[in-house]
Amino acid sequence: MIPVLVAAGVAFLVTLVLGPVVIPLLHRLRFGQRVRSDGPTRHLQKTGTPTMGGVIFLFGAAAAVLVVAFLPGGVRAGWIEGLLVLAVALGFGVLGFMDDFAKVVHKRSLGLRAREKLLGQVLIAVALAVTAVFVLERGTDFLVPFSGIVVHGGLALDLGWWFFLGVTVFVVLATANAVNLTDGLDGLAAGTFAVAALAFAMIALVMDKTWVGIVLGALVGGCVGFLCYNFYPARVFMGDTGSLALGGGLSAAAVITKSELFLLIIGGVFVIETLSVIIQVIWYQLTGRRVFRMSPLHHHFELVGWSETRVVLTFWTVGLVLAVLGLAGLKGLG
C-alpha cells in the first residue's frame, strides 16, 4: 500500500508544480478549446480555455512511477504489469494528443478521422490482449462480481483466445471513449476517474498486482493535482490527450486484474453517460424526439437548471457509491 501512496503523492506534487508552467505555455501556443455552439450557453465563456492539459498529469504520473521504481528496496515483482498499464495509458494519450492537435492547430472540428482513431485504438487494445495472455500468462478467465467465481475455459464458460481478444478490444475502446464522453464539465472526468481508479487500485492490491496499483495510484494523484486547475472555473482542460489516456489505463488495469465485469459497476458513471448518448441517438432516429434535453447526461442536468458544480459533485458522489458497491463484489475473490 505504501508504494501506491508514494506514487500518488509524487504525481500530485509534480502535477501541481507543472500546472503554472504548462498552462501559460498552452496559452501562448493558442491551444484553446473550441466550444459547441449547440451546447449550454454558459459554456460559450469557456472558449479559448487551453486544452491538451492531460500532458500535465500524464507527465506527473510517469515521473511518479519512475520514482517508485528506483526506490531502494522497492517493489520489483510484477513490474511488467504496471508498465503495460502505463504504456496503454500513454499510447491512448498520444492518440488523444494527435486528435487535439488536429482540432486546435489544423482546425479540424472533429480532430483525427474516425478510421484513424479507431485503427490506433484497436491496435493498442490488441497489443494489450496479446501481452496479457502470452507474456503475462493471464489466461482468458475473468472474475464475476459478488459470486466468488472465476469463470474459465472448461470450468464454467469456454471463452477461448479469440473471444477474449474481442472482449478485450471492446472493453478498452468502450472505456476509453466513455471517459472521453464524460469529459464535458470542469473536473467531471478527472474526479470520477480518480474515484474509479482508486477502487481498481484496491482490487489490484487484493489480487497481488502491486505494480498495477502503483500506476493507478500515480494516475489518481495526477488527477487530484490536475483538479486544482481543472475544477470550476477551469483554467485548463485535459482534452482527448487526458481523457483517452485515463480510459485506456483504467481498462488495461481491469484486463490485467481479470476484473472487466467490475468496470460495469465501478465505472458506472461512464457507462451511464455513454448509454445516455446511445439512447438519445436511437430514440431520435426512431421517433424524431429526444429523451434528454441534451446528451451526454451531464448536459441534460445543466439544461434543467443545475449549476455545473452541482452536476459534477453529484456525479462524483454517484461514482463513489458505485465504487464501494463494486468493491463489495470482491467478496469471495482473491
Curated annotation (Swiss-Prot):
Record Pfam families: Glycos_transf_4, MraY_sig1
GO biological process assignments: cell division; cell wall organization; peptidoglycan biosynthetic process; regulation of cell shape
Catalysed reactions, semicolon-separated: UDP-N-acetyl-alpha-D-muramoyl-L-alanyl-gamma-D-glutamyl-meso-2,6-diaminopimeloyl-D-alanyl-D-alanine + di-trans,octa-cis-undecaprenyl phosphate = di-trans,octa-cis-undecaprenyl diphospho-N-acetyl-alpha-D-muramoyl-L-alanyl-D-glutamyl-meso-2,6-diaminopimeloyl-D-alanyl-D-alanine + UMP
Pathway involvement of the protein, from the record: Cell wall biogenesis; peptidoglycan biosynthesis
Primary localization: membrane
Cofactors required: Mg(2+)
Keywords in alphabetical order: Cell cycle, Cell division, Cell membrane, Cell shape, Cell wall biogenesis/degradation, Magnesium, Membrane, Metal-binding, Peptidoglycan synthesis, Transferase, Transmembrane, Transmembrane helix
EC number: 2.7.8.13
Sequence intervals crossing the membrane: 2-22, 55-75, 78-98, 116-136, 154-174, 187-207, 211-231, 236-256, 262-282, 311-331
Enzyme class: transferase
Cellular compartments annotated: Cell membrane
Membrane topology: Multi-pass membrane protein
Gene Ontology MF annotations: metal ion binding; phospho-N-acetylmuramoyl-pentapeptide-transferase activity; UDP-N-acetylmuramoyl-L-alanyl-D-glutamyl-meso-2,6-diaminopimelyl-D-alanyl-D-alanine:undecaprenyl-phosphate transferase activity
GO cellular component, one term: plasma membrane
Record carries keyword Magnesium: yes
InterPro entries (UniProt xref): Glycosyl_transferase_4, PNAcMuramoyl-5peptid_Trfase, PNAcMuramoyl-5peptid_Trfase_CS
Family, per entry: Belongs to the glycosyltransferase 4 family. MraY subfamily.
Function in brief: Catalyzes the initial step of the lipid cycle reactions in the biosynthesis of the cell wall peptidoglycan: transfers peptidoglycan precursor phospho-MurNAc-pentapeptide from UDP-MurNAc-pentapeptide onto the lipid carrier undecaprenyl phosphate, yielding undecaprenyl-pyrophosphoryl-MurNAc-pentapeptide, known as lipid I.
Protein's UniProt name: Phospho-N-acetylmuramoyl-pentapeptide-transferase
Organism of origin: Desulforudis audaxviator (strain MP104C)
Gene: mraY
